[in-house]
Curated annotation (Swiss-Prot):
Keyword terms of this UniProt record: 4Fe-4S, Cytoplasm, Iron, Iron-sulfur, Metal-binding, S-adenosyl-L-methionine, Transferase
GO cellular component: cytoplasm
Record localization: Cytoplasm
EC number(s) given by UniProt: 2.8.1.8
Name under which the protein is recorded: Lipoyl synthase
Residues annotated for [4Fe-4S] cluster 2 binding in this entry: C63, C67, C70
Gene from which the chain derives: lipA
Binding positions ([4Fe-4S] cluster 1): C37, C42, C48, S276
UniProt-listed SUPFAM superfamilies: Radical SAM enzymes
């Protein structure tokens, strides 16, 4: 049995120390931007920042939710920064990004949940870097009328919203969210703008059963989600939800095989898979898989 107090070898990553890593870090700091890489203590930060890829977190650094898996601060949110979209667009230019991922904290305090701020960020990047493809990873916009339409009209290349875990664990792991609201959000984005690729992810190792994971796959395909990511849950601090299991690389391969039979355009399932990890390369693969499927129809 795996010792849950010690990370297995397949989870361990090298400490970041490259010149490019520190260049990315300095640029983010100088432009006063937040990143989910830092705030969520992502294990892949060294690899991504060394390749000058960072997932920018907009709408402040304080979340209005308190999910049991997440390391982002929770409490009274920051004031909305009207200059953030411009600074984000500047970062995209300076990092020479071909593909950018934008995420955010939950903003239940805002009338549209921050949807219009996402749209402004997309528009600013389109103006200054028209060839850069844009992926957004949004909150669920629970009870935020009109938010879905704002996002769909902004037309990101990829819309990502993570279901995070199986529905039976929502009350303990993601208490402020509703599983079927997340599915509805993904479904409605695709319905309003079919050309947008949709993506969702979940963590394993929280105590879920394999049949529950498979049911989530089916639910996501029912919502016409194109791309599924599955990764190992890692406990940020001792005050967060405990790890119930370290899922082995072989078990991840098994989950990937099952998911591929469901009809997703693309599946990424490894211990270190995260929503935006290798998102640039994955977007190219996603487009390629779509074109192959289109040609075979």
């Amino acid at each position: 049995m795996t010792n849950l107090n010690k990370r297995p070898d397949w989870i361990k990553v090298k400490a970041p120390n490259s010149v490019e890593y520190y260049q990315t870090k300095d640029l983010i700091k100088n432009l006063r931007l937040n990143t989910v890489c830092e705030e969520a203590a992502c294990p892949n930060i060294g690899d991504c920042w060394s390749r000058k890829h960072a997932t920018v977190m907009i709408l402040g650094a304080v979340c209005t939710r308190a999910c049991r898996f997440c390391n982002v601060k929770t409490g009274r949110p920051d004031l909305l920064d009207p200059h953030e979209p411009r600074r984000l667009a500047e970062a995209v230019q300076k990092l020479n990004l071909q593909h950018v991922v934008i995420t955010s904290v939950d903003r239940d305090d805002l009338e549209d949940g921050g949807a219009s701020h996402f749209a402004e960020c997309i528009n600013e990047i389109r103006r200054s870097s028209p060839n850069t493809t844009i992926e957004i990873l949004t909150p669920d916009f629970l009870r935020k009328e009109g938010a879905v339409e704002i996002i769909a009209n902004a037309k990101p290349d990829v819309f990502n919203h993570n279901v995070e875990t199986v529905p039976s664990l929502y009350k303990t792991i993601r208490p402020g969210a509703r599983y079927y609201n997340s599915l509805s959000l993904l479904h409605n984005i695709k319905k309003l703008s079919p050309e947008i690729f949709t993506k969702s992810g979940m963590m394993v190792g929280l105590g879920e059963e394999i049949n529950e994971v498979v049911q989530v796959m089916d639910d996501l395909r029912e919502a016409n989600v194109d791309f599924l990511t599955i990764g190992q849950y890692l406990q940020p601090t001792k005050s967060h939800a405990e790890i119930r299991k370290y899922v082995t690389p072989e078990e991840f391969k098994y989950l990937e095989r099952i998911a591929k039979t469901k009809g997703f355009l693309m599946v990424s399932a490894t211990p270190l898979t995260r929503s935006s990890y290798h998102a640039d390369k994955d977007f190219q693969k996603l487009k390629g898989n779509y074109n192959i499927r289109l040609a075979s129809m």
